[in-house]
Amino acid sequence: MRILRWLAWSVGVLFLIGTALQLVEYFNLWATPPPLAPLNMVEQRLAVQDYRIAIWPIFALNNFAFALGFIAVAGLGLALAARLGSGDSQRIVLLTSLGIAGVLGAVGQFMVIGAAQVTIDLAYCDCGFKNEEIVSQIWGQMLIEGAATWLINAASVLAAIGIVGADIAFRRRMPAAWDIVSWLTAIGLIATVVVGFINVEGELGFWLQVLVAGILVPVWAIWLGASLRANPEPGAEAGTAVA
């Protein structure tokens, strides 16, 4: 029971930290990027390289927090499933959806960190093919980040399924308002994937992610951990009923 609570709280806190670090980067609270200029791809990368190096700690910690958060999601799925009977249909839903979501999400976030770190450690070798190196580096990073985005999208969809499954399984043990938060969180996770897939212009995708990852997911997870803490184990309830 204690492990379940800590996993739930870890999910909430880690996603909150990751979102807070995203906002630090967005509002230029750690470092300020240079003004945009009509430069080609190589010139643009060289112009922002100092900024990329300066913001790297925030970028890395941001994605690392989300990676750990996804790992906690996988653990939470296992812990929630363990509280259900072997014949409960939601047991397999929680095991597969939240478990796989945690793995895919963590792998995706670590891929983003690894792809960016290479470009931070060495922008180019200055061996006579600087332009070619930088262009190939940018495209390589884009390919890796594209694959990582799809892993995270899949994780978001599976997490939404898992959240609905948790709501169905534990609805009677949780406050009624948590049921609403569960559905809002699941819908929000699906919406972030849809908005990203259809390439909506503007900042809708960013702020939707902030809402979901920085507010809805933390509220859902922390509330779950706090409420289950106040409830007895299912075994204890069954024992009392038999007695």
Give residue ranges: language-model regions.
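Hydrophobic, aromatic-enriched alpha-helical segments typical of multi-pass transmembrane helices
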Residues: M1-A243
